[in-house]
């Protein structure tokens, strides 16, 4: 199973949010420095989110992210504020391994098919942000139907990966909710990366046992609650 340390970028800085709220941001310095820290500790993949994009400025941090992708040279999944096929193509041109489509994929599902056909399904990841079993969109403020149904639709449209985020536990460092993860993995055939609540070695073990492709480590990694080398060891 792959481990993806999170590098979330807001205003040119590496930050972590609680429950996706901008005002909760804790800054951890330069994004490239954070990325190198995790790579030096053994990471061979990163989960990069352009939070300025998620909050409305899709072009912000483009040069920074392009430099980060080039400098690190490892597997990178990239998301945050992608609102058009043109946006997605520009971010894929940075060299990121794959891009994450969330609200845009719900609003325009055919974009998954278009991008998968143009760039290959392995470079298209559909984001399934779930709140109480419903897909959450627009900064997790609205719901748009059963998360399993959407995951299956994204798979049928050609997405090569799914990113599942349990909004109910994201950023709280309280552990994952196993049931919804297992339900999702049991209902699709494409690889699933899990984010939200991964805060202990036992969470990594549970995700591996459940058949997840990968786990995103965010707040718990930056706070020191989970150790990257232990998570990597557990994932092997």
UniProtKB/Swiss-Prot annotation:
Location within or outside the cell: Cytoplasm
GO molecular function: 1-(5-phosphoribosyl)-5-[(5-phosphoribosylamino)methylideneamino]imidazole-4-carboxamide isomerase activity
Pathway(s) the chain acts in: Amino-acid biosynthesis; L-histidine biosynthesis; L-histidine from 5-phospho-alpha-D-ribose 1-diphosphate: step 4/9
Gene Ontology CC annotation, any one: cytoplasm
Keywords noted in UniProt: Amino-acid biosynthesis, Cytoplasm, Histidine biosynthesis, Isomerase
One Pfam family matching this protein: His_biosynth
Claim: Membrane is one of the keywords in the record: no
NCBIfam families on file: 1-(5-phosphoribosyl)-5-[(5-phosphoribosylamino)methylideneamino]imidazole-4-carboxamide isomerase, PRK13585.1
Family as reported in the entry's similarity comment: Belongs to the HisA/HisF family.
Protein name: 1-(5-phosphoribosyl)-5-[(5-phosphoribosylamino)methylideneamino] imidazole-4-carboxamide isomerase
